[in-house]
């Protein structure tokens, strides 16, 4: 009889545990989904900020070209557009600013506006590494950067990443100066101010892993 009671208790405990796990499985799945969604949201926000910075810098370059070709009105339009992109209050610039170990302006915020990934200069080709690079390229084409990097790491391929950093405060000030100078029809000086915005970009190179 005791054995029967004990067996009944164990069965009841196991049954309740199964129900508890079943009840909590959707919660765990929901939490995981929320984490994935938050990660995707953060990545999308960072990408949007980088795009705004990159578009602003392209506007600066084309504005200088417009001045060179004698089209100050176009230069003014592009400069205003670049300034608007960097003054967007809805963008959380500080949240995605890169803490700079190599930056030369301590009171500024550096924004990653572009990046490139390449093979280390010390790379020596082997059939295995060539195959890994091919697979990595396929994964990169599908947007799987993490998988591509892991493929190269496992194959012992050294990878370097170059990040192009824009000093936000300095660039905003340079654009404000350029706008004032364009309004005064001081086009040579405006071009120099725009050049100053371009020259503020720095490149931060980092070895993701070495071979």
Curated annotation (Swiss-Prot):
Induction or repression: By EvgA.
Entries under InterPro entries matching the protein: Uncharacterised_YfdX
Stated name of the protein: Protein YfdX
Signal sequence range: 1-21
Pfam families given in the database record: YfdX
Disulfide bond annotation, renumbered to this chain: none
Taxonomy of the source species: Bacteria, Pseudomonadati, Pseudomonadota, Gammaproteobacteria, Enterobacterales
UniProt keyword list: Signal
NCBIfam families attached to this UniProt entry: PRK10316.1
